[in-house]
UniProtKB/Swiss-Prot annotation:
Domain of life where this protein originates: Eukaryota
PANTHER family hit by this protein: PROTEIN PAT1 HOMOLOG 1, TOPOISOMERASE II-ASSOCIATED PROTEIN PAT1
Comp. bias regions, Low complexity: 314-323, 367-380
Modified-residue entries (Phosphothreonine), positions: 178, 194
Sites bearing Phosphoserine, chain numbering: 177, 179, 184, 278
Record motif Nuclear export signal, residues: 86-95
Effect of residue 595 to A: In mut1; Abolishes RNA-binding, localization to P-body and interaction with the decapping machinery
Name by which UniProt lists this protein: Protein PAT1 homolog 1
Effect of residue 86 to A: Loss of nuclear export
Segments of this protein annotated with the region Region H: 389-448
Source organism: Homo sapiens
Biological role stated in the UniProt entry: RNA-binding protein involved in deadenylation-dependent decapping of mRNAs, leading to the degradation of mRNAs. Acts as a scaffold protein that connects deadenylation and decapping machinery. Required for cytoplasmic mRNA processing body (P-body) assembly.
UniProt keyword annotations, A-Z: Cytoplasm, Methylation, Nucleus, Phosphoprotein, RNA-binding
Subunit structure: Interacts (via region A) with DDX6/RCK. Interacts (via region H and region C) with LSM1 and LSM4. Interacts (via region N) with DCP1A, DCP2, EDC3, EDC4 and XRN1. Interacts with the CCR4-NOT complex. Interacts with the Lsm-containing SMN-Sm protein complex. Interacts with EIF4ENIF1/4E-T.
């Protein structure tokens, strides 16, 4: 059978696939075996060895030690009786020397040596799920029946019934391939290396002080574990790092092979001072990574080695008492324990000696080991599967658009963005942002007054205050350079498309050009007026922040800009007594112009605002026609309503006549008034008319000492409005935006009860009046 000079010679990383399909080369393998081990290495009858080992299971544990040598190979007899006697004498001398050591005596007195029990012989290391797992059957059971390989650190399978309780010797093994040299074992026989069920623990001194290395096969466990639901193949074992297989190559009941150098290193460590050797140094001692010390008392071991094993988490499981019968449930997925991870990270890479292998086997083994090392270096470099999985996923999810810009380009973009924030007047250059935060501050102040909760601190962007350098842009000029564009090429570019030229009259072109130019001028005026409006709205903030001596100048500047806004709206030219309405109507035909007028009205004086209202009332039918699509005129109702409360009765009457298109003289009005009809069919016009009637009635009732002429004009206007409201159909009448509350008394003075009810129905004032 095969022999190995030391523990490191066991080829643990051989691949099962590398040994298949080599039946044609049996003769070459036999020749290499003879050259390596000698011609008589496989001459013994291994079937008889099987039978002797099977008979040992029924004998007492006391007789096991006596029959162990008979169950081994015939090479054990080569030691001789004198060598065995010498080993016994040396072991007794070591035991006597140890008992004379006071440190060991204290350890023995405090904690006696545990006696091995039949049921808990191997429980110190091999029974816990958090410690190393059970060894499994031969790795190469078909080709090399004499070699046993440890099971990689896997969780212990829970008991699953009577089938697992049966002994390994009672199971029928599958038929194996027949070798011309070794032969085929019987089907019912136990594998080579299977120990008895109970075996005595060899003494520690006999393991260390053995005269020469003793080759012992590691025995089989009582039953097979089932890691991860299935057994690992040799291919999977080869993919496991070699350092992880160094946890326990032999059970605690079988001593490993210790070379003289290893024994010297082990005995030399006993002379060290306590604490001089770290767990990592202890794990690097060759041949000491197994379990030969597991069967010894932990206190005795600590005293012998000189307390060179501090109680670390990675080593506490090796030298502690046997764990409980019911280990705690594992909350983590099955995998190597913390002590195995320590050994994996601290122990050196285990490279078995492959000099006895066939050259073809050695080449295949080296190739597989190189592939495994490169794979583990790429995927398991940090030692954590979860972190590698996450890092691999992060690598797959990498942004394809990352690192497309250089740092210089990123800084350039950042500088451009910061240039937009560098301003001497942030309120003017960043108007919307500043207004947005002003609204937020007002809301927070209102919440503070109401006391609805703690004040919320809002982060506000602080713009850097730097001087803004104004410079005129000058295009780059290349004097005398080739390829310079000529003026004719710029003014008259080459025609790329043949456009169809339509003949148009000069009058049409002139008229269209005038309309286009007029609209452009109106848009320019609106933009200029809007800039003045923003400045005027900003004067309130500037007035509060200015000093006392600066405020008069600010007020004069504000008045000047308000007058400029009014002139832009009315289009008053220098030396012109009364401006025309055409300019204002053009502004009111544009949606932005109508909204601008609604914002300007509160800043104008009463006379200026009244002029704007009069102009709007005169041209209201045309403005209603232009506003059919936008419907922006209702935004003017609120500022007009506020203005009416500052106008006298005469102005109200004149405004009503302008709105109804009545002549200023007392002539008899026409029976039909299309101007007033258009006003009543629009919700803005009807709402403005009702507000004017309500305000005029209040003024007439509050001042009875009015002139008769003015009173007659008011009565005439009221009769005209009432007649037109009664004449227009209800379907054509628009729904007003707002309804005054004093219209009942207003109409009751000029119509009877029947007409009053009809007016109430049309204007939908029933609920408001009653």
């Amino acid at each position: 059978m095969f022999r190995y000079e030391s523990l490191e010679d066991c080829p643990l990383d051989e691949d099962e696939d590398a040994f298949q399909g080599l039946g044609e080369e049996d003769e070459e393998i036999d020749q290499f075996n003879d050259d390596t081990f000698g011609s008589g290495a496989v001459d013994d009858d291994w079937q008889e060895a099987h039978e002797r080992l099977a008979e040992l299971e029924e004998k007492l544990p006391v007789a096991v030690n006596e029959q162990t040598g008979n169950g081994e190979r015939d090479e054990m007899d080569l030691l001789g009786d004198h060598e065995e006697n010498l080993a016994e004498r040396l072991s007794k001398m070591v035991i006597e020397n140890e008992l004379e050591d006071p440190a060991i005596m204290r350890a023995v007195q405090t904690r006696p040596v545990l006696q091995p029990q039949p049921g808990s012989l191997n429980s110190s290391i091999w029974d816990g799920s958090e410690v190393l797992r059970r060894i499994r059957g031969p790795l190469l059971a078909q080709e090399m029946p004499t070699v046993s390989v440890l099971e990689y650190a896997l969780p212990q399978r829970p008991p699953q019934g009577p089938e697992d309780d049966r002994d390994l010797s009672e199971r029928a093994l599958p038929r194996r391939s027949t070798s011309p040299i070794i032969g085929s074992p019987p089907v019912r026989a136990v594998p080579i290396g299977t120990p008895p069920k109970q075996m005595a623990v060899p003494s520690f001194t006999q393991q260390i002080l053995c005269p020469k290395p003793v080759h012992v096969r590691p025995p089989m466990p009582p039953r097979y574990p089932a890691p991860y639901g299935e057994r690992m193949s040799p291919n999977q074992l080869c993919s496991v790092p070699n350092s992880s297989l160094l946890g326990h190559p032999f059970p605690p009941s079988v001593p490993p092979v210790l070379s003289p150098l290893q024994r010297a290193q082990l005995l030399g460590g006993a002379q060290l001072q306590p604490g001089r050797m770290s767990p990592s140094q202890f794990a690097r001692v060759p041949g000491f990574v197994g379990s030969p010390l597991a069967a010894m008392n932990p206190k005795l071991l600590q005293g012998r080695v000189g307390q060179m094993l501090p109680p670390a988490p990675g080593f506490r499981a090796f030298f502690s008492a046997p764990p409980s019968a019911t280990p705690p449930p594992q909350q983590h997925p099955p995998g190597p324990g913390p002590h195995l991870q320590n050994l994996r990270s601290q122990a050196p890479m285990f490279r078995p000696d492959t000099t006895h292998l066939h050259p073809q086997h050695r080449r295949l083994l080296h190739q597989r080991q190189q592939q495994n090392r490169s794979q583990h270096r790429n995927l398991n470099g940090a030692g954590d599967r979860g972190s590698h999985r996450s890092s691999h996923q992060d690598h797959l999810r990498k942004d394809p658009y990352a690192n497309l810009m250089l740092q210089r380009e990123k800084d350039w973009v950042s500088k451009i963005q910061m240039m937009q924030l560098q301003s001497t007047d942030p309120y003017l250059d960043d108007f919307y942002y500043q207004n947005y935060f002003e609204k937020l501050e007002k809301l927070s102040a209102a919440e503070e007054i109401q006391g609805d909760g703690p004040k919320k601190e809002r982060t506000k962007l602080i713009t850097p205050q730097v001087a803004k350098l104004e410079h005129a842009y000058k295009p780059v000029q290349f004097e005398g350079s080739l390829g310079k564009l000529t003026v004719s090429s710029v003014n008259n570019p080459r025609k790329m498309i043949d456009a169809v030229v339509t003949s148009r009259s000069e009058d049409d072109e002139t008229k269209e050009k005038q309309v286009r130019d007029k609209r452009r001028k109106t848009l320019v005026i609106i933009e200029k007026t809007y800039s003045l409006l923003l400045d005027v709205e900003d004067y309130e903030r500037r007035y509060l922040l200015s000093l006392e001596e600066e405020r008069p100048a600010l007020m004069d500047d504000r008045k000047h800009k308000i007058c400029s806004m009014y002139d832009n709206l009315r289009g008053k030219l220098p030396g012109q007594e009364r401006p025309s309405d055409d300019h204002f109507v053009q502004i009111m035909c544009i949606r932005k112009g109508k909204r601008m007028v609604a914002r300007i009205l509160p800043f104008l004086s009463t006379e200026q605002a009244a002029d704007i209202l009069m102009t709007t009332a005169r041209n209201l039918p045309f403005l209603i026609k232009k506003d059919a699509q936008d419907e922006v005129l209702p935004c003017l109702l609120s500022p007009f309503s506020l203005l009416l409360y500052h106008l006298p009765s005469v102005s109200i009457t004149s405004l009503l006549r302008q709105l109804m298109n009545l002549p200023q003289s007392a002539a008899t009005p026409a029976l039909s008034n299309p101007h007033l009809t258009a006003v009543l069919q629009n919700k803005f016009g009807l709402s403005l008319l009702l507000i004017l009637l309500s305000r005029g009635e209040d003024l007439q009732s509050s001042d009875p000492a009015t002139e008769s002429t003015q009173n007659n004009q008011w009565t005439e206007v009221m009769f005209m409005a009432t007649r037109e409201l009664l004449r227009i159909p209800q379907a054509a009448l628009a729904k007003p935006i707002s309804i005054p509350t004093n219209l009942v008394s207003l109409f009751s003075r000029y119509v009877d009860r029947q007409k009053l009810n009809l007016l109430e129905t049309k204007l939908q004032l029933v609920q408001g009046i009653r």
